[in-house]
């Protein structure tokens, strides 16, 4: 009898232990981890505008962007080798990740339009990062920059290039960047934007709101197709004045791109109707249209370096 009791007791203990182990596994498997979504985009920029992606802490990003002349139309074609003989804008930038959610940068651009020789300071802060369980359904980043022109002042007081004082040289952009990655193939973004220019041409707008939309379609591990569109809310009065008095028609910026990732490099081939690179200019000042062949190809190159890593801190 004692032997039977002992056997039953051992079996009971064994069953209890096994049941407890299985229960622990169930609770562990149902625990919410809130894993953050990575690589909504491969770069901090999409075609022209900002993405919600950030540089990692202590990461330095050296960026070069170039836009050529019209690929087709009156000023393109074979006579300019499809725009490669000309350059509408060039930008060189250094951007740095202070933390995983905060980055700053400086840049110098050729500029396009009335204002040229542009120096930029920028900051971007990520408030939210999407999680795989949709506890946080979207990523949200705030972007702002300040740009100042270093060119000599013009003499026409009705021109944007006439500077009565130093503040007339300055312009600003503020954006909220809202992104969502769907599965592993598709990323979409909305970008409510505000552009302020201290001094503008007669009948132009100092303050302008715009709404941007962009997306990325993953083609392979290293290839992605990009698209980007901005709708500036320019007043009808301003549009009519520039069209009737100066023969200038404003168009909405539309860009397409092919993104290639190779190790620490991200290389993008772009096609866009805007001549400028900075948001301060391409949002309010695009006067070229795809329908007349006034689009240009260009490229963005990003090369990242890690500074002050863990090994450096230990030293």
PLM features: residue spans?
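Transmembrane beta-barrel domains of Gram-negative outer membranes and organellar outer membranes
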Residues: 20-152, 157-163, 170-174, 179-190, ...
């Amino acid at each position: 009898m004692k032997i039977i009791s002992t056997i039953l007791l051992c079996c009971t203990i064994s069953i209890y232990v096994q049941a407890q182990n299985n229960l622990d596994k169930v609770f562990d498997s149902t625990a919410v981890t809130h894993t953050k979504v990575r690589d909504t985009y491969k770069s901090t920029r999409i075609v022209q505008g900002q993405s919600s992606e950030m540089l990692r802490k202590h990461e330095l990003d050296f960026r070069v962007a170039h836009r050529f002349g019209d690929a087709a139309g009156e000023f393109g074609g074979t006579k300019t080798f499809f725009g490669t003989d000309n350059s509408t804008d060039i930008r060189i930038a250094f951007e740095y990740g202070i933390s995983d959610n905060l980055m700053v940068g400086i840049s110098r651009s050729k500029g396009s339009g009335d204002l040229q020789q542009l120096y930029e300071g920028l900051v971007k802060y990520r408030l939210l990062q999407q999680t795989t369980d949709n506890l946080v359904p979207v990523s949200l980043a705030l972007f702002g920059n300040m740009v100042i022109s270093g060119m000599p002042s013009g003499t026409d007081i009705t021109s944007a290039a006439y500077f009565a004082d130093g503040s007339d040289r300055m312009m600003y952009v503020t954006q909220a960047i809202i992104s969502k990655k769907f599965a592993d193939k598709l990323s979409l973004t909305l970008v409510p934007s505000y552009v302020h220019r201290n001094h503008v041409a007669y009948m132009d707008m100092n303050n302008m709101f715009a709404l941007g939309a962009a997306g990325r379609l993953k083609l392979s591990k290293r290839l992605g197709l990009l698209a980007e569109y901005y709708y500036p809310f320019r007043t009808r009065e301003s549009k009519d004045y520039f069209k009737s008095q100066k023969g200038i028609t404003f168009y909405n910026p539309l860009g397409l791109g092919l993104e290639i990732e190779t190790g620490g490099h991200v290389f993008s081939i772009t096609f866009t109707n805007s001549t400028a690179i900075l948001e301060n200019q391409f949002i309010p000042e695009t006067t070229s249209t795809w329908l007349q062949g006034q689009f240009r190809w260009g490229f963005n190159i990003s090369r990242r370096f890690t500074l002050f890593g863990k090994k450096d801190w230990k030293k």
